[in-house]
Amino acid sequence: MTYQKKHQHLRIELASPEQIRNWAERVLPNGEIVGQVTKPYTLHYKTHKPEKDGLFCEKIFGPIKSGICACGKYQGIEKKKENIKFCEQCGVEFIESRIRRYRMGYIKLACSVTHVWYLKRLPSYIANLLAKPLKELESLVYCDLFLARPITKKPTLLKLQGLFKYEDQSWKDIFPRFFSPRGFEVFQNREIATGGDAIQKQLTNLNLQNVINLAHLEWKEFAEQKSTGNEWEDRKIQRRKDLLVRRIKLAKHFIQTNIKPEWMVLSLLPVLPPELRPMIELGEGELITSDLNELYRRVIYRNNTLLDFLARSGSTPGGLVVCQKRLVQEAVDALIDNGIRGQPMKDSHNRPYKSFSDLIEGKEGRFRENLLGKRVDYSGRSVIVVGPFLPLHQCGLPREMAIELFQAFVIRGLIGRNFAPNLRAAKTMIQNKEPIIWKVLQEVMQGHPILLNRAPTLHRLGIQAFQPILVNGRAIHLHPLVCGGFNADFDGDQMAVHIPLSLEAQAEARLLMLSHKNLLSPATGEPISVPSQDMLLGLYILTIENNQGIYGNKYNPSKKYDSKKKFSQIPYFSSYDNVFRALQQKQIYLHSSLWLRWQINLRIITLLNQEGPIEIQYKSFGNSFQIYEHYQLRKNKNQEIISTYICTTAGRILFNQQIEEAIQGTYKASLKQKTFVQKIEKNG
C-alpha cells in the first residue's frame, strides 16, 4: 500500500526476496530472529494449540488471545512499540491477538521455483523476455530438460551448450571420477542447471537495455520489408512484430519500475497471516481448515524432503534430487494457482483445493467483492418487471425481499406491540411467516421510502426513491415511465434495493429523490419520463378507431352480422360510467364508435375552417339536431344549446379519463402545497 499526494491507493508489483524477508522477519528483544516457517504442522492434536515453528506458530504470528503467551501467562498490553514485552520462555509477545491478521511468515525454499503466473499466464512474460518457446521453458522448469552453461560469460569445462536430457549424456559418469563429492556438486551447480534455478540464472544474465535495442532493430527490419504476397508469410511476420513490441514494452516496464526480472523466480515463499487462512474447531473436537493450509503443508513437506536429500547429496541419487525439485515446483504451483497446468490437486473427497488465485479472482474474489465493490447491509437485488398498475412514485417489492430488508423494523414493531416477548420469539414468528407479520410490515413500509439503483450509475437519476408496496413473486415491479432515468428495460435487467436508515437519509429520499420529482433530465432540462416503445404502441391501439367520423360508415354492423338485417345504429351514452359498464358487459368494444354526451361549457376543438352541419333535423316543438362529422348539437326553439354529443370510442374515453384524473390530482396537490406554505408564513 502506497500513498501519493495524500490519496490512498493500492499498487501490485513483484516483490524482491529481501522485501519478502522484511515482511516476515522480526528480531525479538533477546536478539532471536523469527519469521521462518520450518514445520508443516498446524495445531497439536491433543491440546489444539499451535505447534512451534509451524503454520500457526504464536512466536511467528502473534498470540491467539490478547496479552496471553503460549505458556498461559498474562501481562498488560503496552500501546507503545518500544515497550512491548515478551515471554522469555516461549518467545511470544504480549500484544493484541488481531496482529495475527496482518503478520506474515515465509518459507525458505531449498531450490528456486518459477512463479507460475509469469510462466503459464498468457502472454508469458518469461517467454517474452528470454525469447524462447513456452514449451521449451516448461520442460526446463519441470526438470524434463537441463541447461548447460546457464551463465555464458564464465569459462566452462563442458563443450555442451543449450538444452539436453540428463540421462542422454555420458559426462555424469566420467566427471565424478575427477572430483570429490563436494567438488562435483559445485561443478554441477555452476555448469548445469534445471528447474527454477536455470530460469533465474538466465533472467539474471539479461541486459534489459540490450533486449530493447535488439528488439527495436529487428522490428525496424521487418517494418522496412514490403509485403511478400504470401498471406501465410505476412501473418508470420506480423506475429513476430507483435511479439517484439510486447518484449520492448515489458523490458521498458521493468526498467521504469526498477524491478528485476529474476524476481519472477521465488527463493522465499510468503506465508499468509493465520486469520486469512483460519482453522476452526467445531463440536466434539472436529476441525475444519482453509485449503491454503493443506497446500502450504504440502510445500513444506516436499521442501524439507529436498533439504534432507541435499544435506546427504553424496548418498542420494541425482535423479531423486531432480524429481524432488519438480515436486516442490508443482506444490508451489498448486498453492498459487491450482489446476493451471491441467489436473488440479484434490483432497480425499476428490474436490480440488482452492488456491490463492481462486480466492482473489472472479466476482466473489477478494478484489471485486471486498475491495472494488463491497456488500452493503440493508440491501438486495432482483430482476425488474413492468408494473403499469403502479403510480409513478411507487414500486412493487417482493414479500420475500421486503421481510428480509425490513426485518429489524418488523421485530421492533412486534416487540413494541407485545406480539412477541423477545427477539428470538419475533424471529421465530418471521421464519414461520405468521399472518400478523405482514400487517406489521405494511405499516412499517408505509412511511419508509426505499432507493432503487441500476448500475452503471452515470447520472443522478440512476438512483431514485420510491414508496414500496408488497407484491407476490420474486421480481421488483417498476413503473415503465421511470425507465428513462435508469436506462433500464424489461429484458432481464436487475436493480439494487437500498433502505435509508437515518432520518436525514429518509427525509432526503422523500423530498428530493422520489421519482415523480425527477421528471426532467439534469443534463438537457427536457422531460425524461416520457412514454416510449410499448407505451406508445399501447396508446395508439387504445385510441385508434375503425371509422373516422360518420362519413366513414354511418352505421356499424352488429356482432351477429346478417346482410338481411338492418345495421345497428351508433349507440348513445350519457356518461363515462355508462360506457365502461357497456364495455364490461361486452355490448361495445374498445374501437367501437359511439356518441357521448359532453358538457356544454367545454369547448369542442374542430378544424380551422368553420365546419357546416351535415344534417339538420327539426322536431315538433321547435327543437333541432345539428349533426356534424364529429359532434352533434341539440338546440331549443330559441337556438340555445341544450346538449352536446361527441363521436368517439371507448378506448379514447378510457385514455381521457386517465388524463383528467392525473390533472385533477396535480391541481389538488398544488392547492395543498399553497395552503401549507400560507400557514407557515402566517405562523412565522
UniProtKB/Swiss-Prot annotation:
Its EC number is 2.7.7.6. InterPro entries: DNA-dir_RpoC_beta_prime, RNA_pol_asu, RNA_pol_N, RNA_pol_Rpb1_1, RNA_pol_Rpb1_3, RNA_pol_Rpb1_3_sf, RNA_pol_Rpb1_clamp_domain, RNApol_RpoC1. Its cofactor is Mg(2+); Zn(2+). Keywords: Chloroplast, DNA-directed RNA polymerase, Magnesium, Metal-binding, Nucleotidyltransferase, Plastid, Transcription, Transferase, Zinc. One of its GO terms (cellular component) is DNA-directed RNA polymerase complex. GO terms for molecular function: DNA binding; DNA-directed RNA polymerase activity; magnesium ion binding; zinc ion binding. Binds 1 Mg(2+) ion per subunit. Binds 1 Zn(2+) ion per subunit. Mg(2+) binds at residues 489, 491, 493. It catalyses: RNA(n) + a ribonucleoside 5'-triphosphate = RNA(n+1) + diphosphate. It is found in: Plastid, Chloroplast. Pfam families: RNA_pol_Rpb1_1, RNA_pol_Rpb1_2, RNA_pol_Rpb1_3. DNA-dependent RNA polymerase catalyzes the transcription of DNA into RNA using the four ribonucleoside triphosphates as substrates. HAMAP family: RNApol_bact_RpoC1. In plastids the minimal PEP RNA polymerase catalytic core is composed of four subunits: alpha, beta, beta', and beta''. When a (nuclear-encoded) sigma factor is associated with the core the holoenzyme is formed, which can initiate transcription. This is DNA-directed RNA polymerase subunit beta'. It comes from Marchantia polymorpha.
